[in-house]
A protein has these predicted regions:
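Structured-RNA-binding interfaces characteristic of tRNA pseudouridine synthases
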Residues: 1-273
Length: 273
């Protein structure tokens, strides 16, 4: 059976997340409809990450099995799908993979970046892709808290789901970086896998520390308490980007995140080291 790997980027603003839902527009649903029209049969496509409503992706990876009798080669299907998909979903690459490849099961890790904006807005486009916050932030405290979250821990405190059969709350964070880019703060989170809304909960916690509503010195205690009502908010979805998916452990460990390309278009200042 042929096995194709799609690499997809999308603006999640208009979508109720990745996963197909009966009464809502989703990214997976849009791909399903386009593939079914192209191959004139009911098709399925499986993604590596079930991004939530309003969350964006720079590198979503999906697995697709074309019909065995189909005469359409991958290169032609790629061109056709790029024309069929809406402008806010872009098919970046189509690759032929070994039969056993699975976009979700074979992934060894993912990297997300969350965009925060501090202070007065200079561009009307920013709220679509950022969490807008006041100017005053204690970056040093945020970085101190972030260091205490890197490693292998039970992240129940940072999950929005409880009492799920088979839930494995112990995860490994390989990185939790905070970078300044003018008025923007970029929070990059890398790990082997994540609990439901875990990245947004981590960002919400760091924001509470940065605004000095929580003490960075209490990070380990809050982490290990495994209590979801820990005095911080879940960050809103629009600032979150799935930045990279990894299928090689060495690439996960060596990955260096870059500045999200659209930041330069928003006129909010140059990068700060």
């Amino acid at each position: 059976m042929a096995n194709w790997r799609f690499t997809i980027a999308y603006d999640g603003t208009a979508y109720a997340g990745w996963q197909i839902q009966p009464d809502n527009q989703t990214v997976q649903g849009c791909l399903h409809d386009c593939l079914s029209r192209l191959f004139q049969a009911e098709m399925t496509v499986g993604g590596c990450s079930r991004t939530d409503s309003g969350v964006h992706a720079l590198c979503q990876v999906a697995t697709f099995h074309p019909p065995p009798e189909s005469p359409i080669p991958a290169t032609d299907a790629h061109r056709a799908l790029r024309q069929m998909l809406p402008p806010d979903i872009r098919l970046l690459a189509t690759e032929i993979m070994p039969d056993g490849f699975h976009a979700r099961h074979d992934a060894v890790g993912k990297c997300y970046t969350y965009v925060l904006h501090r202070g007065e807005l200079q561009s009307p486009f920013i709220p679509r892709y950022c969490w807008i916050l006041p100017d005053a932030f204690n970056i040093h405290a945020m970085c101190a808290a972030a260091k205490q979250l890197v490693g292998r821990y039970d992240f129940t405190t940072f999950s929005a789901t409880s009492n799920v059969p088979g839930l494995k709350p112990v995860k490994t964070l390989t990185r939790l970086d905070i970078r300044e880019h003018g008025r923007f703060l970029l929070v990059t989170v890398g790990g082997d896998s994540f609990l439901y809304k875990m990245v947004r909960r981590l960002v919400g916690f760091l924001v509470a520390v940065g605004r000095e509503r929580l003490d960075a010195g209490h990070t380990a205690r809050i982490r290990d308490a495994r209590e979801r009502n820990a005095g911080f908010d879940t960050a809103p979805p629009q600032g979150l980007f799935l930045e990279q998916v990894f299928y090689d452990e060495a690439e996960l460990q060596a990955f260096t995140p870059g500045d999200l390309p659209f930041l330069q278009l928003m006129g909010e200042g140059s990068a700060q080291k």
